Amino acid sequence: MPITHKKGNAVDALINGEVDVLLHCCNARGVMGAGIALEIKNRIPDAYEVYKHNHELGSITIGEYLRNDNRCGYVVNMVAQAGYGIANVRYVDYGMLAKCLNQVEVFSCCTNNKIGIPYKLASDRAGGDWQIVLELVEGILGDKFDITVYEL
């Protein structure tokens, strides 16, 4: 299936039922302080609570994902960066992102999920190259799921 690109907000798309699953990249430090992570924390607080709780338990591992099933669908926190910080530094680990995407494929394979991702997933705050990230998404999930990239 081709990936669709559209103007809009990925969090709104999940809340409004336009997609069933929202993917985003996050760090392994228990912080959701900027970008779409902060919006998820503020608008879908139970997704943040799962992430925070797992961090407090010491069970957040890079290359793994945390899935939160809530009233509006699934938020998938793909832990693909060890840290965060200054601009123009690559924090995302492409191998770990690919590992997370493969896990998402396994979790989603039994359903006909519509997946939403933010434009520049793992590329804006995480410092990755959007074209590389998009190729990973297309290669791992693109032929199996209806995927929409939301750009504000």
Predicted regions and their residues:
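Macrodomain-like recognition of ADP-ribose-binding/processing modules
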Residues: 1-152
